[in-house]
Amino acid sequence: MVPRPEQTPDALRAALAAVDPKRLPEMQRTKDEAFAKAVEWQSLSPVRSWVLTWARDIEIARRPDLAARHAHAKNNLEHEDADVAREALRELSAVLDEAMKAVHA
């Protein structure tokens, strides 16, 4: 398992390259957007949000248990059975919460 990266742009990028390299262009695009908003808003909150979002997503990708739960939940979000779709939404929320708590630990 890839170690949990520090919450810096370079460390997050290196970790993403190891666990989900196809998302690197998305990461760069959202980083550029966050930094542009930070300048426009004269606030670091868009940058902090970007860091936390990617730290959370990398946490999911680097942990097979979370990655499997995340994929299963996403695959069932639009299930024809409303109960299955609701459970998928609940599980997706639980996975995101667990990953966010882990990166705040």
For each feature predicted by the language model, list its residue ranges.
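Charge-rich, solvent-exposed alpha-helical interaction surfaces
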Residues: A15, T30, A34, W50, ...
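General structural signal for secondary-structure boundaries
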Residues: T8-A11, E59, A82, L89-E91
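Short terminal alpha-helical segments
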Residues: M1-A36
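Amphipathic alpha-helical interaction modules
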Residues: R23-L66
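Generic amphipathic alpha-helical segments used as scaffolds and interaction surfaces in large
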Residues: P3, A14, A18, A38-W41, ...
